[in-house]
Amino acid sequence: SDASRMDFIRFTGEWVVYYVLIALGGGVLVGLTMAVFSAVGVDVAPVVFGWLVPCGAAGAVVVAAALVEAKQSVIENIAPVLTKLFTPLFTAMLLALIVAAVIQANFLLAGRDLLIIFDAVLVVVLGLLLYSISARDPQAKVGWFERLQLVMVSSALVVDALVLAAMLARIGAFGFSANKVAS
């Protein structure tokens, strides 16, 4: 019937929009993960492209369909949904990054590229945190998501301390320069 066809077209259109937005966020996550871990000296490409990307793509299909079925409004509600989707993923990435940095002996002698990539990761974390705080109801009780945000912020502070230690190690090893002092 015509109504069924229109429902199918609506569902498919909304599903494509959600899937593309989730895929773009996943692409940022994969790109930052690959850049950070390669700068630390850990080859995560087999895990990322062998497991993370295929499982993420398959999961995004299901999540996008669930969002459409839940009648989420694409314009008004997508940002809080994406924040709740990517906060756990970025928290896991930060925790794995801390473990990799601790295991790698050469982390304190990291290059500028690594420090710049860490800055990008911290900007994304700040964006996730600020948006979720601004969209949160002040009267709502603290739940699992707020606790997860605390873990994410704590992890980001540890990463920030590691970056600061690496910057100080670079200054100690190579001396002061205008770029090092400015950063």
Functional labels for PLM-detected ranges:
Residues 1-56, 66-83:
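Membrane-interface helix-loop-helix junctions at boundaries between adjacent transmembrane segments
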Residues 5-17, 78-84, 140-155, 173-183:
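Membrane-helix boundary/juxtamembrane motif in polytopic membrane proteins
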Residues 8-11, 37, 49, 63, ...:
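Phenylalanine-focused residue identity feature
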Residues 24-32, 93-102, 157-170:
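Hydrophobic alpha-helical transmembrane segments in multi-pass integral membrane proteins
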Residues 46-59, 112-123, 179-183:
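Alpha-helical transmembrane segments of polytopic membrane proteins
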Residues 62-69, 124-139, 156-170:
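Alpha-helical transmembrane segments in multipass membrane proteins, preferentially the mid-helix core
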Residues 76-156:
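Long, well-ordered mid-to-C-terminal structural blocks that present hydrophobic/aromatic surfaces
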